[in-house]
Amino acid sequence: MSRLIINKSNSRICNTIVKNYLIQTKYTLQQQQHQQQQQQQQYVRSYCSLQQPKPSKPNMIEIVTHFFDKVKNKSFIIENYLNNPIPEQQQQLNKNIKINNTDKDNDTLEQIQLLDPLNNLGKRKGNEIFKVVENDLSNMTHNIMKTITDGVSANSTYSPSPSKKTHPILSSISSYYFELKGKRIRPTIVLLLSKALSSTVHGSQLKLAEIVEMIHTASLVHDDVIDEASTRRDVISINHSYTNKLAILCGDYLLARASVVLSTIRNPDVTECMSTALAELVEGEFMQAKSNGVVSFDNYLQKTYLKTGSLITNSCRSAAILSGADSNIINISTEFGKNLGLAFQIVDDLLDYTGSAEECGKATSVDLTLGLATAPVLYATQEFPQLEKLIKRKFSEIGDVEEAKRLVALSKGIEKTRNLAIEYCNRAIQSLLKLPQSESRDLLITLSHIVVTRTK
């Protein structure tokens, strides 16, 4: 009997201990989950407001934007990059850049100032920039037209027979956008950076400018088909002038001709850089098409880098490689291209809300119509959470687009987006200041200002 009582007592004690242990374990797990949620929320807040998180935690903005130091690693993808710590040099660079709080509750939002380290250098006019590379841009356009119409790149040793030349209709369609006056920002960046690093533009660097412009133009042709755009650069788009089928073939042809020119440079590192840029451009377009109404700044910045930033990043890296620069200068050039590329696309997304069709040379307010959530509406969601429902259904119901535009206008989304673009521009300028002083370097600073202050 005594043994039975003791056993029952022990049993009750054991049950109590087990029960308390389970309760404590459940409480501990809940606490851990709560802490993880708080950490994730803190990352998102710091991510969207550009606040620096605690030193012990990685800064998500920096992680996303510090890209391509491992460009030669073919398996390198953004998802892996997000788990890497910020290199020491980049942390030091962060200290030199003033990051204002863009998530204030005040009625007014402090405007981040553009860095102008050389006394109003940013106020110089754009024509000063293009005048320096005017002859190179002219030669570039001539070579592109020759490549398109004759089916052979300039200075190539390959000579096709007359029957192998480009079909006249394909040649005409492919030349369509090159005959118009575009911004030509990307080749200008390549040419100015080439001059800044080696005082002159080598033949291989001029070819690089041609490649970048052909890849970019091909992406515009394909974009117009995907977006069903009716205008481009103030004229009817190729897909509307001809057909979607011919437009797709035209874009494919431009990419093929760009690949031929790339092969004549005969530099495996440059080939890998530009091939990666082309692959990531497609990946970014695919990511946008399959967004499924994701409410995520992380997703937005990844797509922005892939669609726009990667081509500028890799073209700057390639220009540095072709100049014979050391690894430090190559990495500085890569950082410059990456940050300027992100700034450029963020401004494009901003102009979709603030610009006019006449100024931009293309339709505006199309992102919402296409169901795309870019920086202005993502920032506005912080103040108007009801926007999340609209984003998730990709603004597909009647009145969604108008309601989203109304709430963005009422929010600080426009100002925060402008601050974000300026922040990336400032980082690009900080990279340029690490290069030796030259007229071309200074003009790149001016160009960086133009990128974020433009109205089209």
UniProtKB/Swiss-Prot annotation:
Pathway: Cofactor biosynthesis; ubiquinone biosynthesis. GO terms for molecular function: all-trans-decaprenyl-diphosphate synthase activity; heptaprenyl diphosphate synthase activity; metal ion binding; prenyltransferase activity. Gene3D superfamilies: Farnesyl Diphosphate Synthase (1.10.600.10). Mg(2+) 2 binds at D223, D227. Binds 2 Mg(2+) ions per subunit. PROSITE patterns: POLYPRENYL_SYNTHASE_2. Supplies decaprenyl diphosphate, the precursor for the side chain of the isoprenoid quinones ubiquinone-10. Its cofactor is Mg(2+). Belongs to the FPP/GGPP synthase family. It comes from the Eukaryota. It catalyses: 7 isopentenyl diphosphate + (2E,6E)-farnesyl diphosphate = all-trans-decaprenyl diphosphate + 7 diphosphate. It comes from Dictyostelium discoideum. Its main location: mitochondrion. This is Decaprenyl-diphosphate synthase. InterPro entries: Isoprenoid_synthase_dom_sf, Polyprenyl_synt, Polyprenyl_synt_CS. One of its GO terms (cellular component) is polyprenyl diphosphate synthase complex. One of its GO terms (biological process) is ubiquinone metabolic process. It is an enzyme of class 2 (transferase). Mg(2+) 1 binds at D223, D227. Its EC number is 2.5.1.91. It is found in: Mitochondrion. Keywords: Isoprene biosynthesis, Magnesium, Metal-binding, Mitochondrion, Transferase, Ubiquinone biosynthesis. Pfam families: polyprenyl_synt. The lineage of its organism: Eukaryota, Amoebozoa, Evosea, Eumycetozoa, Dictyostelia. Coiled coil: none annotated. Isopentenyl diphosphate binds at K183, R186, H216, R233.
